[in-house]
Amino acid sequence: MEEVAWMYEQDPARMKPISETKGEFVSPISEQLLKDIWEYIQDGNNMVGDTLPWESDFRFKPKTLNVWAGINAHGKSVALQQCALHWAVQGKKTAIWSQEMPCETVYANLIRQATAVPKPTEMFHALVAAWLNNWVMVWHQPSMRFEDVFTFLDAAKKENIDHVIIDNLTSIGLTSDNLWMHQRELIVHLKKACMELGLVIHVVHHVRKLDSEKNQPDKFDVVGSGDITNLADNVFIVNRNVEKQEKMADGWGSQTISSSDTRTWSELSDGLKSAVKVRYGQPCRIKLWWNQIGPDTGAFTDGQHAPSTVYFKPPEDMEYDQEVPF
């Protein structure tokens, strides 16, 4: 108590009466909290929360901050947009802000992913857009400052959003005199927003320039302050298989990889999504392939011959002027 009294004398602005704080003891354990604890114990760490679009025990816990990092153009945004569609099917709403893509590009990607059709007809894409209106909202703001991020989050909360995608951290206008300090401050406030607003927040970020684009980055390659990964609940690395892409382009798809590896280049995955930090659970690696329609739809499957996932199915009596995967 003497130490607390001393702190109050030194800096009274930082020491507030209990009545003015938001903190409180949760003891004795309430009936609702007891129920929540029981469900958590029964389900285990991995079974609480929203799933990924691909086969995995990983779950996005409520009120968590997630960082999605990787080399530029390796599929971070593609994977997250596909997640938004997957969550929509689960009855969860997502808000997206993208500095690198205009709104029409984000929606075009979502429509192609949702249908697994590279170029849907005008009627078809209008139906998908109407469905998206209920589940995925895109925030239009050409430039985002520190304080604008939280205006966006507050607006998302008012729209009953469950997941928020911020694409990307580098595009947010932070004061450059001490960029790492301001990045840390932003991550701290994002983590606080997760808890206070009940949101699951996903932040896209870059990794440092590696010796080769074929190298697999890890969490220590994430650009900027180490607190970005330290404070995040989960950190994902999305990496494209550039070597396979080059071999396939050169016509080596049917060739074996080496004398010790008898797989062919075409058998390798097109990409890899690695959970390199998981606060509640175990790290995991998910091999990804472009779906049967190909990269034009910007959607992944978790098996070489896995069927394309169709998130939106139109009326059965609708006519098509092209082949569709359902």
List each model region and its residues.
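Conserved inter-motif catalytic segment of the P-loop NTP-binding fold
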Residues: W6, E31, Q90-N178, E185, ...
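The Walker A/P-loop phosphate-binding site
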Residues: W6, K16-A116, P325-F326
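Hydrophobic/aromatic beta-strand patches that form the interior of the parallel beta-sheet core
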Residues: N66-W68, A95-W97, W139, H202, ...
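Structural recognition of the conserved hydrophobic beta-strand(s) that form the central parallel beta-sheet
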Residues: I96, I165-I166, L199-H206
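Cofactor-binding loop segments of dinucleotide-utilizing enzymes, especially the Rossmann-like FAD-
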Residues: Q99, H206, R240
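Catalytic acidic motif of RecA-like/P-loop NTPases
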Residues: T170, K191, R208
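Charged helix-capping and loop-helix junction motifs
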Residues: W180-H189, D218-V222
